[in-house]
Amino acid sequence: MEKEKLLYEGKAKKLYFTDDSEVLWVEYCDQATALNGARKEQITGKGALNNQITSLIFEKLNAEGLETHFIEKLSKTEQLNRKVSIIPLEVVLRNVVAGSFAKRFGLEEGIVLQEPIVEFYYKDDALDDPFINDEHVRFLNIATYSEIEFLKSETRKINEILKKIWAEIGLTLVDFKLEFGRLADGRIILADEISPDTSRLWDANGQHMDKDVFRRNIGDLVETYTEVLNLLENAK
């Protein structure tokens, strides 16, 4: 597999064409962002940690029979992905009250929800990724109602697998963000990444093991992510 010209550069990744039109070469970068990109910082080692964590998680999801874009890890900072057209939605699932959800409803963080809540956010930096509902998704021609139901059900299925993965290493999956994409034949599959950048994880003492250590200036991001990676590797 040969890496070719740059296709896209985002906040945390660079995507390259390959000599296979259906495969992308993905490089994870060291940039950390918060406040929807308003705060940016280069943190040496972050890209390698996220790539390795994401690779381990996606390997487990693939083994469970879920269809994802992940093919294989190439190096500490690189992986191969199936080429998809990203659906402009952030699909967020919440198991525990935290973050913006707590602020929106005036609740204390840490309340366990009776059942998981799935939310949609429209991926648009200029609009600050607004919270939207099913009808908005249809109005914007992002997805059909049947596709919306698939996104919800697939996210709930993924949640059950992820909760077990994280629980095995002593972490609670508080909430997380997923992105999905369409293959050339129109099928929708899981894409993007699953890491402490996109998940809120708490240990048994309530310590944050995710990007909140950067967002809230409460810890060292590299040390935290390294601990998460070590826990996952030791659980293999």
UniProtKB/Swiss-Prot annotation:
Associated pathway: Purine metabolism; IMP biosynthesis via de novo pathway; 5-amino-1-(5-phospho-D-ribosyl)imidazole-4-carboxamide from 5-amino-1-(5-phospho-D-ribosyl)imidazole-4-carboxylate: step 1/2
Catalysed reactions listed for this entry: 5-amino-1-(5-phospho-D-ribosyl)imidazole-4-carboxylate + L-aspartate + ATP = (2S)-2-[5-amino-1-(5-phospho-beta-D-ribosyl)imidazole-4-carboxamido]succinate + ADP + phosphate + 2 H(+)
Molecular function, one GO term: ATP binding
Top EC class, one word: ligase
EC number: 6.3.2.6
Superkingdom as given in the UniProt entry: Bacteria
Any single Pfam family the record assigns to this protein: SAICAR_synt
InterPro entries: SAICAR_synt/ADE2_N, SAICAR_synt_PurC, SAICAR_synth, SAICAR_synthetase, SAICAR_synthetase_CS
Gene Ontology BP term (one): cobalamin biosynthetic process
UniProt-listed SUPFAM superfamilies: SAICAR synthase-like
Keywords: ATP-binding, Ligase, Nucleotide-binding, Purine biosynthesis
Xref: CDD domains: SAICAR_synt_PurC (cd01415)
Protein family membership: Belongs to the SAICAR synthetase family.
Protein name (Swiss-Prot/TrEMBL): Phosphoribosylaminoimidazole-succinocarboxamide synthase
Gene behind the chain: purC
